[in-house]
């Protein structure tokens, strides 16, 4: 994908993975609009890369359309939309209803709402690219965090549906599925999340590097941690064996926290 003068929007780009992707895109010649709930953070990254900053709340139905509309005009149209905003919510069935709803709104419905705004124009033009930051949790699971795991699976499923439905009509859909990344989200993932993910955690810049490679080759799954492909294959090959392995991992983590 030639990014020269390409209009791109990156959500959740005030820091972490989103900011790193925005910097890489701008460095490759794209015209980038930085979107974040934190208006100051969005403006700071935008000023750094010579782009535009548009605040927006990916957790609300009214929060997605305005940034898409505001970004589209100065960019001359959005050719690449990076749905990166996400939220980590821990716990299991006992997690409060509000936590489950927040995870659903940010991790899933923000993608749906962005697609609702963008797809008609992309179909009319015959091209567009929709890239979502999912997580390896969407391919596997995340111990200690049912809302996060469930909504990331749903985000991946929506990406698969989008690709199957629109892939032959000019719309490329890609899902980025890293394991641990050294961001605020990792720090807030709780003792279980940190114990599992920290040993193999990579930087946001390494994720952005993988994204740039993925944009060039167009693959659906972008895996900054290559070992995720083996874990995903093992899960599909023998799900019961894989689940038994996850239970053993959970037991080791709990022993370490005792």
Language-model-derived ranges and their functions:
Residues 7, 14-15:
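Conserved glycine-rich cofactor-binding loop
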Residues 28, 140, 161-172:
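Active-site-adjacent segment of SDR/Rossmann-fold oxidoreductases
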Residues 39-40, 55-68, 97:
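The beta1-alpha1 cofactor-binding region of Rossmann-like NAD(H)/NADP(H)-dependent oxidoreductases
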Residues 65, 87-101, 124, 144-147:
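Conserved mid-core segment of classical short-chain dehydrogenase/reductases
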Residues 115, 151:
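Active-site helix of classical SDR
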Residues 135:
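Residue(s) in the substrate-gating loop at a strand-loop-helix junction
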Residues 175, 191-231:
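C-terminal helical subdomain
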């Amino acid at each position: 994908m030639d990014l020269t003068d390409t209009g791109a929007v990156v959500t959740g780009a005030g820091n972490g993975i989103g900011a790193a992707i925005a910097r890489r895109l701008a460095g490759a010649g794209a015209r980038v609009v930085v979107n974040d709930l934190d208006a100051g953070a969005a403006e700071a990254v935008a000023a750094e890369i010579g782009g535009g900053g548009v605040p927006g709340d990916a957790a609300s139905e009214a929060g997605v359309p305005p940034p898409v509309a505001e970004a589209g005009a100065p960019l001359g149209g959005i050719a690449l939309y990076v749905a990166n905003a996400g939220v980590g919510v821990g716990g299991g069935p006992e997690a409060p209803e509000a936590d489950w709803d927040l995870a659903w709104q940010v991790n899933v419905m923000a993608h749906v709402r962005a697609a609702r705004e963008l797809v008609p124009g992309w179909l009319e033009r015959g091209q567009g690219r929709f890239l979502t930051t999912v997580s390896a949790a969407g391919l596997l699971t995340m111990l200690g965090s049912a809302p996060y795991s469930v909504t990331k699976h749903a985000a991946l499923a929506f990406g698969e549906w989008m690709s199957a439905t629109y892939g032959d009509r000019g719309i490329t859909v890609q899902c980025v599925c890293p394991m641990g990344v050294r961001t605020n989200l990792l720090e807030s993932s709780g003792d279980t999340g940190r114990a599992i993910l920290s040993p193999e955690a990579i930087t946001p810049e390494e994720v952005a590097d993988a994204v740039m490679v993925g944009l060039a080759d167009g693959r659906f799954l972008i895996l900054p941690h290559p070992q995720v492909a083996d874990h995903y294959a093992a899960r599909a090959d023998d799900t019961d064996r894989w689940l038994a392995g996850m239970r053993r991992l959970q037991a080791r983590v709990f022993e370490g926290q005792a």
